[in-house]
């Protein structure tokens, strides 16, 4: 996909299995499907350990999912890349990509929208295209989906005080 290291939102780098062992809450092993954002990890662990979650901490506890009292249905994950121009990654093209700001969402129905004001935007159906090889962004059938997903990213930006420029979609 033209980016190196773990500086990318593509599933090969961003979709990481999460293993939590919490025998005090659940004795049996189980696989939990759904989207889980890294930002929710610390609040979840603190909650599982019975600790207070500091108000300044971003994210939401998903401990009820671990305890079997809830699921991740409807959970959407937002991601941001603010450009890291810290070293030469090999070619001018890769260095340029590494310096761009990206905002992304993965919806609960496994669609991913990557927005960048200075590069081509991307839309992937992760159910049918888990390796993100078929960019559906310019497919007219997806206009409404893109608008809805972009609006969710903008709402997330508003809620978090993020001011990265986004393309008009």
Give a label for each model feature.
Residues 3, 58, 78-82, 161-169:
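Short, solvent-exposed turn/loop segments enriched in Gly/Ser/Thr/Pro and often Arg
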